[in-house]
Design a protein with these regions (language model features):
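Non-catalytic, C-terminal membrane-associated alpha-helical segments of glycosyltransferases
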Residues: 222-275
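Conserved donor NDP-sugar-binding/catalytic core segment of glycosyltransferases
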Residues: 91-124
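A short, conserved alpha-helix in the catalytic core of glycosyltransferases
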Residues: 143, 153-186
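Acidic donor-binding segment of Leloir-type glycosyltransferases
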Residues: 20-55
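Short beta-strand-to-loop acidic/aromatic patch adjacent to the donor-nucleotide binding site
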Residues: 78-87
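Conserved nucleotide-sugar donor-binding
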Residues: 135-148
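Short, well-formed alpha-helical segments that are part of the catalytic scaffolds
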Residues: 6-26
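Glycine-rich, basic loop-to-helix element that forms the pyrophosphate-binding segment
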Residues: 56-73
Length: 275
């Protein structure tokens, strides 16, 4: 097993160095893709010759960078790719245990391995054919070659869902190791007062993120008509509700909702061009 890792940066903070350090010791190569228009990543702070750094001062999204990472693996004979978010890290010996589980699994039809990002998860068994998130997942490069590139129409939000569905359509599998945990941020959270006058914490996404969530979900519902159960429209409605009730840009969010529907209808995909 030759394992490369990739992380995609966008306006990161200094926690990125600690996060990368939580897994770089067990990978053979570390690919860092910087989508920031004004990059400030200092690879010297990690003290490793494993790092390959890419920056073109342009936000290319998630799918394009993952395709670059997979192509690098193909060209340099890496068998697997660990994909991480900039705000994700492994705890304790989790990454070493994770890799050992993969090495001990002889099923050649597993295209993607995933981990649990919910600290409250107490389940110990592995689950087959779950929709995995990219952060913390390990991709089988040979099967990724067979099903084709990540869909760059999606840009962000839904890239991982589409990839998993295409694995299923080609009779490959995913596996989720519940007992392997990562620390992972699901977005900005804020303290709120609910309509029932209770104090709570809610994830509140930006209007741009809401745009991608809606447009890409509509796109995937057409692309994969037999897998609507994988797309979790109810979760997106909840994100919209939180943005409208507790966000600071309600009017902009409403415009983003209409723009997402319009762009989907007009087949305007990829990166959102701000007017």
């Amino acid at each position: 097993m030759r394992l490369a890792a990739s992380v995609i940066l966008y306006k990161h903070d200094d926690t990125i160095y600690r996060n990368i350090s939580s897994y770089i010791q067990v990978v053979d190569k570390m690919l860092v893709f910087d989508n920031s228009e004004n990059p400030n990543f200092d690879q010297n702070l990690i003290h490793s010759d494993k790092i390959v750094y890419y920056s073109d001062r342009n936000n290319q999204g998630i799918a394009h960078r993952l395709n670059q990472a997979i192509l690098y693996c193909i060209n340099n004979n890496y068998s697997h790719l660990l994909t991480m978010d900039q705000d994700s890290s492994f705890t304790d010996n989790a990454i070493a245990n994770y890799i050992q589980l993969i090495k001990d699994n002889n099923d050649i039809n597993i295209g993607m391995y995933g981990v649990c990002y919910d600290e409250t998860c107490k389940v110990e068994h592995a689950a087959i054919n779950e929709i995995l998130i990219t952060s913390g997942s390990i991709i089988n490069i040979s099967l990724a070659e067979k099903i084709g590139n990540f869909d760059e129409n999606i840009f962000i939000d839904g890239v991982d869902t589409d990839f998993c569905i295409r694995l299923f359509q080609n009779e490959y599998k995913t596996i989720l190791y519940h007992k392997i945990k990562i620390k992972h941020s699901l977005g900005e959270t804020k303290k709120v007062i609910t309509p029932y006058l209770k104090k709570s914490k809610r994830a509140v996404h930006s209007s741009t993120r809401i745009y991608y969530l809606i447009r890409n979900n509509l796109y995937l519902r057409v692309k994969h008509p037999n897998h609507h159960h994988c797309l979790k429209w109810g979760n997106i409605l909840n994100e919209i509700k939180n943005a409208l009730l507790y966000g600071d840009e309600r009017a902009i969010t409403i415009r983003a909702i209409f723009a997402a529907r319009k762009d989907f209808k007009n087949k305007c995909f990829g990166k959102l061009i701000q007017s």
